[in-house]
Amino acid sequence: MSAWVLPDHIADVLPSEARHIEELRRGLLDTARGYGYELVMPPMLEYLESLLTGTGEALDLQTCKLIDQLTGRTMGLRADTTQQVARIDAHLLNRKGLTRLCYCGPVVHARPDRPRATREPLQFGAEIYGHQGMEADLEALHLALDCLRSAGVTNINVDLADVRIVRSLLAGVMVDMQVLRGVHAALAAKDASELERLTRDFPAASREGLMALLQLYGGIEVLDRAEKLLARTAGVQPLLDQLRWLAQRLEGVSVSFDLADLRGYAYYSGTRFAIYVPGASDALVRGGRYDEVGAVFGRNRPAAGFSLDIKQLVAVVPERPLKAAIRAPWGDDPQVAAAIAALRRQGETVVCVLPGHESEVDEFHCDRELVQVAGQWAVQAI
């Protein structure tokens, strides 16, 4: 095998794309800061006990593991940053009241989570801790939308659901975990025949409600239909009211619902949203409420947030034009060095042409050059 071959679904990021990614990263962090979110930087490596405690089987399977050469203990490369941020909120900050945190950094997946996906996403996310009300869910959703808009994303669709609806339908149903997994899989695949087989011995209200979920997707009318079809299930009406409340406060986007969407079922504790845009094969942003995320760290308090992969985002956002640069001669002349330094302090990109490379071009388009006129260095159009 050639020495330069990289692992499957791992790739170098070349200058043009790297510049675009970095511009998006800065814009996303600036947008989060505008909402009052503070940046944190968790480590890439942690012991598995803290990295995976309370996260479920799916994240465990996605985590690349290795042995710490100093202690002999098993460590993991993070596959998701949310649990680490919850640990920071619970133990290191331990603030009373609201805490708003954001992050941006690479994660590593043992397997790609979708076709043609990278196994090294650049994950950006934001979390708000300490508020139980729907205002926190709405703020997280508004921030996610503003992040996409600041990146130049248009034609946005927000898909809403609530995992508590399925939990309400399954309340009191006595079945083993394998059957429950099958029910979840059948709902996710909208497999009516399999769901009917698995729920044959369920109470009538649960069975009929679960079967009804397969048809409860679409626009706002879905909530009206759900109110009728799920009327026999206690606790569902307030959840539908909360989804309607959220939808009514989203402007400039299309809103849909899929009440059988169980992505992140073991992780989310309430409302859940996914944001889709043209050109992306999967949701660009996923988020919602996950109140139990900090429980394993001894501080079980309300939490809502979202995350996205900037490498996925860059594929659907038009690249911004590169600011034209200034070409300058290389030399030991203190005057030209001072002129170049002054231009760079003003925010200009100045590319020095090294001897013998005058005819070469690079990514930076130069529309001006630094020339000597009457003994003074000045910028002129090329």
From Swiss-Prot:
Principal place of residence: cytoplasm
Pfam families the record matches: tRNA-synt_His
InterPro entries in alphabetical order: aa-tRNA-synth_II/BPL/LPL, HisRS-like_core, HisRS/HisZ, HisZ
Superkingdom, natural source: Bacteria
Compartments it resides in: Cytoplasm
Keywords associated with the record: Amino-acid biosynthesis, Cytoplasm, Histidine biosynthesis
Pathway assignment: Amino-acid biosynthesis; L-histidine biosynthesis; L-histidine from 5-phospho-alpha-D-ribose 1-diphosphate: step 1/9
PANTHER family, sorted: HISTIDINE--TRNA LIGASE, MITOCHONDRIAL-RELATED (PTHR43707:SF1), HISTIDYL-TRNA SYNTHETASE (PTHR43707)
Species for this entry: Delftia acidovorans (strain DSM 14801 / SPH-1)
Record text on subunit structure and interactions: Heteromultimer composed of HisG and HisZ subunits.
Residues spanning the signal sequence: none
UniProt key word Zinc: no
Role according to the record: Required for the first step of histidine biosynthesis. May allow the feedback regulation of ATP phosphoribosyltransferase activity by histidine.
Protein name (record): ATP phosphoribosyltransferase regulatory subunit
Other information: This function is generally fulfilled by the C-terminal part of HisG, which is missing in some bacteria such as this one.
GO cellular component terms, semicolon-separated: cytoplasm
GO biological-process terms attached to the record: histidyl-tRNA aminoacylation; L-histidine biosynthetic process
GO MF: histidine-tRNA ligase activity
Family note: Belongs to the class-II aminoacyl-tRNA synthetase family. HisZ subfamily.
Keyword presence, Nucleus: no
